[in-house]
Every structure is written in C-alpha cells, then in structure tokens.
Amino acid sequence: MITSAAGIISLLDEEEPQLKEFALHKLNAVVNDFWAEISESVDKIEVLYEDEGFRSRQFAALVASKVFYHLGAFEESLNYALGAGDLFNVNDNSEYVETIIAKCIDHYTKQCVENAELPEGEKKPVDERLEGIVNKMFQRCLDDHKYKQAIGIALETRRLDIFEKTILESNDVPGMLAYSLKLCMSLMQNKQFRNKVLRVLVKIYMNLEKPDFINVCQCLIFLDDPQAVSDILEKLVKEDNLLMAYQICFDLYESASQQFLSSVIQNLRTVGTPIASVPGSTNTGTVPGSEKDSDAMEAEEKPGSTCVGKSAEINPEPKDQISKMIKILSGEMAIELHLQFLIRNNNTDLMILKNTKDAVRNSVCHTATVIANSFMHCGTTSDQFLRDNLEWLARATNWAKFTATASLGVIHKGHEKEALQLMATYLPKDTSPGSAYQEGGGLYALGLIHANHGGDIIDYLLNQLKNASNDIVRHGGSLGLGLAAMGTARQDVYDLLKTNLYQDDAVTGEAAGLALGLVMLGSKNAQAIEDMVGYAQETQHEKILRGLAVGIALVMYGRMEEADALIESLCRDKDPILRRSGMYTVAMAYCGSGNNKAIRRLLHVAVSDVNDDVRRAAVESLGFILFRTPEQCPSVVSLLSESYNPHVRYGAAMALGICCAGTGNKEAINLLEPMTNDPVNYVRQGALIASALIMIQQTEITCPKVSQFRQLYSKVINDKHDDVMAKFGAILAQGILDAGGHNVIISLQSRTGHTHMPSVVGVLVFTQFWFWFPLSHFLSLAFTPTCVIGLNKDLKMPKVQYKSNCKPSTFAYPPPLEVPKEKEKEKVSTAVLSITAKAKKKEKEKEKEKKEEEKMEVDETEKKDEKEKKKEPEPNFQLLDNPARVMPAQLKVLTMTESCRYQPFKPLSIGGIIILKDTSEDMEELVEPVAAHGPKIEEEEQEPEPPEPFEYIDD
C-alpha cells in the first residue's frame, strides 16, 4: 500500500518523456488520496501541459484539473479539464466529473447569455472546447432518456437547435411540448428569448402528424401574433373543422387581451366574404333558425326547441360561422354562459348577511356589508337582500350611497343585455337632476357590468362623462369608462379622461388618473407615461397622485424589462406616492414572472424606504410576482410577517392573500393565523381579508381551518367592543369567502396558464380600498366561475352529465346557517304545596311507565332504522349536470360518463367552456336557459296597469 506520492512526483523531474508519462498515469490513479502532496508540485504538471512537444500533455491537464478541483479552485480546474480533451470523460459518475460539468455548463450559459444580449457584430466567440463538453452532455442526456434535463440545459444555454432536437427525439413528444410550454409561461425571464422558443414550439406543433392548433394558438397569444391566429381559424373553417375553431375562439377569449382579440375579429371580418367559395361549404341551407336563434342564452327560446333533430343538420353558411366565431371572440358567448351558470347555481346563504346586518352599528360597517353582499351575489343578478332591506339600505348617504349604487354593477356583472334598462333609475337624466352620488355610482356600476368588454356602452359612458356637470358624477363616469374601455387604448377615451385629469379637481382627478391607466393597460404608450408622470410631479392634490400612482403602473402591465427605466426613475423620486407607484409598476410589469431582480428590488424597498405606504406597497407587490409558484410565497414573506412595522406586516398578509388566492395553502394560513390577533387593528383587517382570499371555495376536507375562520369572522363582527377596522376586514372576508353564490374563485391566471389580465388589475385596484372604499368593487374583476360548461355544435348546452370520481362531500357547498329558534318566555310559576306536588309527581311517574311500555317496541325499530341510515356509506363518485360547478382541484378527477354520446374537444381537466362532439344520430336534449333577475321583477309589478279599457265598460 502506498503511503506517499513523493516517489511518483520525483519521476516528473526525469529527462525521459516516457517516465514522465508513467508518473502522470500513476498520479492520476492516486490523486484523490494524495492531492495535498501533489499540489505542492502542481507547477511541474502545468509545465508539462504547456510543453507543445510533450505527447501526453492532455493527461497532464487531466491530473492538474483534479488537483485544482480538490483545492477548490474550480475555474482553473475547468480550464485544465477543457485542455484534457477526450480524456475528460463526461459519462463518468464521479463527484469530480459532475462538479466540473456543472461549472462548465454555468460558464457556457454565462457566455451564451452575454452574447445573446450583444448586437450581431460585437458577439464574442464561445470556447469550442466548452461547447464540445456541453454537446457531449446533451448526448448523454438523450442516451439516458433524461429529456427534461436536456430541455432545461438547452434553454439555459440558449441552444434552440438542441431544444428542438430533444423534443423531437423524446419518446413522448406531446408531453415534452407541454412541459416546454409550461417552462415558457412560468420561468422565462427574458421576453426576446422566450419569443424565439415559442416560435420553435409553434413550428413543432404545426409539423405534428395531427397539428395541435389549440396549443399553437396559446403560443401565438404569447407572441402577440393575431394574424397567425386568424390564419389558423380561417384554415379550420375551410377544412370544415368548425368545432375546433369554436374551441380555439373560447380559449382565446379567456387568455388574450382585448387588443389581440379585436385584431383577430378585424381579420376575420375581412375574411368573412371570400370563404363562401370554398368547396363543401357552399350549401344553400342554413342551421335551423337565424343567427339570433343560435344565441345560446336567448331568453325568448321557444319551448319546443329543446330537442334538435339530427336530420335538420346542414352545414351552416360560412358567414354564419364567422359571425358565431366573432361572437365568441368578442366574449359575448362566454359572458352569457357564465351568467347562466351563476344564476342557475346560486347558493348564497342570506342568513350570513342578515346576521351581519343586524350586528353592524356604524356607516363604515354598513358600507362593508353592502360590498360583501355584492361579492356574495357577484354575477348572480340576485338583489334579493337589498330588496328585503330597502329601509336599511337607505341609511347610506353621500359616498356610501355611491358605493351602494355601484354594488349593483357587481351583482349584475356580465348582465349586459338589460344593463341600461336595469340601471335606468340610477343614471343621469336630462330632465331632472337626481342625486349626484347615485348617478356617479350608476355610471361606475355600468363599467363594472361591462368590465373588459365595453362594446357599445363605451360611447354611452363617453357622452355621459362629457356632459357631467358634477365632480362626483365625473368620478363615477371616469371609473366606469376606464373599466369598459379597459386595454382598448382608444385615443378619444384617453383624451377625454386627460381633460378631466387636467381640471385639477381632486375627486375627478383621482378617478381619471386611474382610468387613464385602465384604458392604456399594458400599452407602454410613451405619450401616456409622459403625460401622467409629468402631471403627477406638478399636482398638489394627494388624491390625484394616488389615482395616477396606480394608473402609471397599469400602463406598464406585462412589459417586464421594458419598464425598468421608468421603475428606476419612479423609485428615485422624492415624492413617496410616486415611489409607491414604482412598486406597483414592478408588480404589474413583472406580474407572474417570478423575476429574481424584481423580487430583490421589492424586498430591499420593503426594509429600507422611509415611508410606510411605500414599504407596504412593496411587500404587497411580491404577491403579484410570485403567484405562479404560490408555495414559494410563505417562505419569502415569513420574516416580513413578523416585522416590527405594522404596515409591513399588513403588506405581508395581503401578499399571501394575493399570491395564494384560491389555493387553500396551509403554510400561508399558518402565517396568517397569529396575525388575526395582532395588536394593530389594520393588520388584523389585512389578515382577515387575506385568509378569505386564500380559502375562497375551500371545504373542510380540502382546507380544515375554513370553519374556524368562518367562526372568527362572525365573532369579530358580533363583538360590540371590537375595532371598526377589524370589523370591516371580517365583513369583507365573509363576502369574499362565499363570492358569486359559492361558485367563483379568485385566480390571477387563466385555466391555460396565461396571466389573467382582468384579475391582476382587479386585485391591484382592490388593494386601494385602504384609501378609498368604492374601489373594493374592483375585486369582482378577479372572480372566475368554477365551472365546466359543455356546448354542442350549435353552441347550446346539451343535457349531459360529468362524473366526479371523489366523494360528494369533498367539494360540497358549505351547509347553510341554521335559523335560531326563538326562546319562549318562561312563565313565573305559582306556589305549590309540597303534598300536592308529591301527589302529582306520583301520577306523572305512573303515566310515564305506561307510555314507555307502549313505546318500547316502536323505539327499537326506529333506532335500528336510524343506525342503518347513519351507516349508509357515502358514494365514491358524483354525477354533475351540465353546466357543472367544478372546483380546480376536482377537475383532476372529472371524466365523462361511460355511456356518454358526447366527446370533449380538449381534456375536461382544463375546465371552462368545452366544445363537445356528438357521436350519436339521436335527438339532442338541451338545457333550458334561465331568466336573469333584476328588472324583470319590476316589470311584473308594473304589468297590472293595462286594465284601463275595462274602466270604460264599467261606465
């Protein structure tokens, strides 16, 4: 056994090259044991490597590399490993090889990324030896079938050639494509490179044996290429693949921005006419009934039309197909279907609201109850609670009246057809001036009903805002117009809002500043930024500054690194409100990206800024950046949640609520629990609201603490001595927890993984309730119905059942509160003598014995029945009728029933609106549409007027 390497090292001083070679071979064998000794003579080995004439110089490099590796000098070790050429065996599993390969990939990645950011002429050549090792590594991954690893390294090193090769060579191409698309959506920090990767994915998807158009369109949304999407839709119509086209249109509406959709619609309109010449689609017959009848939600549908015969089925004319596609893309169909779902499945527990109403004693809690009611009934069109409590509602005055009127917009969200008729009593009239607060609230409500789907209502709101003579009406009009024209970047709307901003009126300016951001959402419009930042630096009104702070951030929505210059200048501003705007801009520009640089900036500001509002905003903004990986958020904010500064603690609570919304994340709830007992009341408010955001639609099985928190909200509301701030939080939390009749969830991303723009905007503006209660209503933008809606070829809902393969109680609605039984007043007992009392007692006992004997037999049989009932096991599955309420976690266990005639066009596990292919020739049974609540009730009450003609007969 060798105890020293001195003898071998001495051979390196020999003249004979063969002896030196022999020494190197021996040293290579013992280097792991004697590296410390060899390191003293490593210079001799280096000299051998540098000697061009030495035959085994590569071997010298290998030994030197191993010595430096043991010394911890990884860079030198890597250099010599590269010098060793093929002697450095990438397939070896030793720790040395693994470490050097890791360093090699890091080094190569760094060089590639630096090169990618340089212009064409300035790119530095990458070391070929480095590339050689990386290529060997890729080959090793492919040989070992470690495709995900290869894709990861290929994306890290910007090697698109390898990326494409890996996907195509893998044994599961669709799986690898899905994995790559997910990486693209969630982890790619650089927009330019992401777009290149998406182009490669589009190419692969299109070249599949059966092109995957649904995923191609998802990529094209990211690439912001509406023309390519239009081409695909046109191609599908030509090929008579209509159902696929409809499915893509629904997916587009859910994931793409308004501008993107309007471009696709524009392209389809120009396409509309020439398609008629396509063979196979020139049939003269049309679908039974005109396009109007094909509206899935037409309330006037004739009772006889619930069965559609297959024989009547003839290809619809292309124009009709295009108009249907435009109707889907415009969002009209999805909004109507969701409205139907929410009305049909409304499961609100009015007892909760009644108890809260009876407990509140001041105007702040009154407003909170009105807001909570609108959340609970969001989109259900049910204003039952308000109708039952008109006298109580009338207590709202001034801005509370504004908020209460606007809450109708949340209740009737998506109820667009009758919106103007519905809100008529609250809207400005030419004849008599009404209450300004009511009219302003009415205009704001119209915006909430049409949020992100303005259409014709934009022009109505535009005119109302032009003619408004009062700052309160202008405030409501600006908010309504901003909501309806969200993301449209319409110049006429922008100019009018700018005019309102420049009037330097605090009330109007606050709403106009925010609305400017809503209209220019994500446009990165340089002129808009210049106008808004310029005015923010001039104005003396804090309210206007607050509105602009959020507005500026919205203009940079989703712009990632393109917003860095603006963020930099805002963060350096001496005005704390503009620094806060900088935090929101980071949140909006990098939302959902998980960008480390953005997180570092926010964390730095959260602990270093001198202003509490800025620090709070910085921590809140973390939630927006991390929402794709909610499990990371608790660890990031756990220390901040224990900060000495209550504003930072509040921010940490809200960040958890935003990031983990709807997930029921246990770690987040564990962090919030102690905060609900915080000594500072507004921290408790934040913790209560955040807990509801996280636990929305969770059941006791999916999230055991939900009932505990329900009791906590109730306790805080009913405690006469508790603080108003905490009560406000608890009331809002109740509303959020049961939102949309227990049928909606808050999610910042769409089902397909895109950042859901209205949700992000809604949650950001909702957080501003800290300054201005009426902005609470914006949360309704983030409510997404948890539904699966199947549609047939005519875009109607067929009667079909889905099978949920888990126990019904897992995702059941919470049980309603029991109505407390009224206690009977106890009568004062009259005095009874002891002798009579004893006699009565004996009599009673005798009667009791008789009765018991009679009852004995009956009781026993009854008890047996009860036991049998209790023992009856809960079934392991449940059948749900279309349209079905299906929770996100439940989607995994959802399937079509075995004997079902319909086949879904995309997996049910994605949820949402799914086109179903009918495999049967029989008649179809359709789901009858339900009528919306609201104005219909008033009409029915007014109907008895026409008996005037009968009066003449009486005469």
UniProtKB/Swiss-Prot annotation:
Organism's domain of life?
Answer: Eukaryota
- List every stretch annotated Disordered: 279-313, 839-879, 932-955
InterPro entries named in the record: 26S_Psome_Rpn2 (IPR016642), ARM-like (IPR011989), ARM-type_fold (IPR016024), Proteasome/cyclosome_rpt (IPR002015), PSMD1_RPN2_N (IPR048570), RPN2_C (IPR040623)
Write the record's keywords in alphabetical order, separated by commas. Answer: Proteasome, Repeat
Give any GO molecular function from the UniProt entry: enzyme regulator activity
Q: Which GO terms describe its biological process?
A: proteasome-mediated ubiquitin-dependent protein catabolic process; regulation of protein catabolic process
The keyword Disulfide bond belongs to this UniProt entry's keyword annotation: no
- Bias type Acidic residues, positions: 938-955
Instruction: Please list the residue ranges that the record marks as compositionally biased, kind Basic and acidic residues.
Output: 290-303, 842-854, 861-874
State the Gene3D superfamilies in the record: Leucine-rich Repeat Variant
The residues bearing each PC repeat, given as ranges, are 403-436, 441-474, 476-510, 511-545, 547-580, 581-616, 617-649, 651-685, 686-726, 729-761
The cellular component terms of Gene Ontology attached to this UniProt record, alphabetical and capped at eight, are: nucleus; proteasome accessory complex; proteasome regulatory particle, base subcomplex; proteasome storage granule
Q: What does this protein do?
A: Component of the 26S proteasome, a multiprotein complex involved in the ATP-dependent degradation of ubiquitinated proteins. This complex plays a key role in the maintenance of protein homeostasis by removing misfolded or damaged proteins, which could impair cellular functions, and by removing proteins whose functions are no longer required. Therefore, the proteasome participates in numerous cellular processes, including cell cycle progression, apoptosis, or DNA damage repair.
Subunit structure comment from the entry: Component of the 19S proteasome regulatory particle complex. The 26S proteasome consists of a 20S core particle (CP) and two 19S regulatory subunits (RP). The regulatory particle is made of a lid composed of 9 subunits, a base containing 6 ATPases and few additional components including PSMD1. Interacts with ADRM1.
> What protein family is recorded?
Belongs to the proteasome subunit S1 family.
Protein name per the record: 26S proteasome non-ATPase regulatory subunit 1
Gene source species: Gallus gallus (Chicken)
Gene symbol? PSMD1
